[in-house]
């Protein structure tokens, strides 16, 4: 506590705060840091909650070094304010001590269905519930959280932290339906028939890309996000160890160099892999992963092969992977023994909802097309979309930023429709 207050006191309270400019959701960082420096933890949390529904998550997984902390003027000649650690401290302190309890708003403005409970879905639900909407989330998994629960390792984002943030949503009046797949159990039309005024698609990108090389479809080639999900289920006691795939002594290669690649590589080490090497077609300076994530991976024993590609994968007569062929930028090839290849090359939206709903247009890669006014509405009236299903895979906070804008669009749309209905009713 003392350390957090002292760190907050280093803030210069700039007239034009660059930290706020660097934050995708425009957090009022100097304001809550000032309250923290004065020991007013409750006031600080009130300010944070005005912009973020997931402070304990953002305090852990946001790329602070590229955003708020990277813009801090103190960082030009020394160490910038540790904004992420301060946000994490406040969110955890609030979670443990119950600093604030938000008042439930009367739910009088309409009903909104949210499909998916990842960062975008949770942000929509929190924002609209605070504005007086009845919000119900439809989640296909047995537990909500999406990528927060199943795609980020426990060592980076403990599952109990995610559960705590979701509990806050439920305390706002948000209802969550588990194990319910829209496009299978119900359609979008079914939801409208149930009386929802608007529907939000926050389903992310669950359809994996294929590895288009010889041997790219053999046993042992897996999606990195699939692997992370299996490990998460195993850690929660919902999956047998043998179903996680990577075992002690395995030799593993990871394709890609974003944060998901770092997560997969470090998790493979934790699961007992003998060796893990990340293969990336560009240089270290061009990787999308945070430098801090890369540094941690190196410390834990992950190897890196730069400016190279895996161009072939070989298997034995039983179809089990035996080796990979790696080609560098000069065209030189070498063969390495391998048991598994994890692909961290991104993914695309699943078509389950679009294929069962008339009027929702997508681009040639399956991403949902939306418009600016009202922000986030698809080509189907009353159906909105945001986050990765529209903008391609990105960070948690960027999905949140987009979702906050969509929440405004939904509120404007529902209010306008109800006003028009009221006028017609008076005629």
Task: Give the positions of each predicted feature.
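FAD-site-proximal beta/loop scaffold in flavoenzymes
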Residues: 217-249, 337-393
